[in-house]
Design a protein with these regions (language model features):
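Accessory terminal helices/loops
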Residues: 1-113, 117-135
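Structural scaffold elements adjacent to functional motifs in cytosolic proteins
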Residues: 72-73, 174-176
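Short glycine-rich anion-binding loops that position phosphate/pyrophosphate groups of nucleotides
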Residues: 77, 179-182
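Short loop/helix-cap segments at secondary-structure boundaries that form the rim of catalytic
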Residues: 80-86, 183-189, 206
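Helix-loop module immediately N-terminal to the HCX5R catalytic loop
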Residues: 92-111, 190-212
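Short beta-strand/turn micro-motifs composed of small residues
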Residues: 115-116, 176-178
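A short glycine-rich beta-strand->turn/loop micro-motif centered on a GG-aromatic cluster
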Residues: 133-147
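Tandem CBS (Bateman) regulatory domains
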Residues: 143-146, 153-159
Length: 213
């Protein structure tokens, strides 16, 4: 190992630490908040379910959204892209749900309404509560299908092929939201790096008057 393992080579303490920590992102913003909350104590999971498992009508959900409540869509990525409630956030239950919630939802006391696949509402509430987000006020009754059937406005996230991207992407208006190590390994020329985990902290670097890919 001393002959082949770089970590056991002739490194100073400073060189060793630098070698092991290069490229490592800071801890997600919710870590410190969750640690502080751990000292105070959380609501029991039974209390969380009692306050969160409230079926809400479309009108109740939209009224809450207008008052600053986050509508969180937890369906599959493709389903969200094909159609979702305007201004809804997306974090899919089928991926790393809890870590992404912790990285992207800055306020741990943010009131939330869940839009989930039928039968997945309680799972979403439980997984949010596990990382400290226990202020879910309800879920949309009937899910997105009920909303779509109501005829109300929907939003979509269009996707394009690499060929379409190459032909039409405006120079300097490409956002790369991967991790710095992935960006450094290979990226689209002139793409702007804004790692998704910390996008909230750098929104002032995005020109809101321009379209981005």
């Amino acid at each position: 190992q001393k002959q082949t393992n770089y970590a056991l080579g002739n490194l100073t303490k400073e060189e060793f630490v630098k070698e092991l920590t290069t490229g490592i992102l800071p801890a997600p913003q919710y870590f410190a908040k969750a640690a502080a909350q751990n000292k105070k104590g959380y609501k029991s999971i039974d209390d969380v379910f009692e306050s969160s498992m409230n079926a809400m009508s479309i009108e109740q959900m939209l009224e809450a959204q207008n008052k600053g409540v986050m509508v969180l869509d937890t369906r599959k990525e493709g389903e969200f892209s094909d159609g979702h409630i305007p201004n809804a956030w997306y974090i899919g239950l089928h991926g790393q749900f809890a870590p992404w919630a912790g990285a992207l939802i800055v306020d741990m006391h943010q009131p939330i309404v869940i839009v989930a696949e039928e039968g997945k509402e309680q799972e979403a509430i439980m997984r949010l509560a596990r990382v400290g987000y226990d202020n879910v006020i309800g879920y949309l009754e009937g899910g997105y299908a009920a909303y779509a059937a109501s005829g109300k406005a929907v939003s979509v996230v269009p996707s394009i092929t690499p060929e379409e991207f190459k032909a039409n992407a405006p120079e300097g208006q490409v956002l790369d939201v991967r991790k710095p190590s992935e960006y450094d390994n290979c990226h689209i020329e002139n793409a702007q790096l804004l790692t998704l985990d910390y996008l909230n902290e750098h929104l002032d670097e995005v020109n809101k008057d321009k379209p981005y890919v």
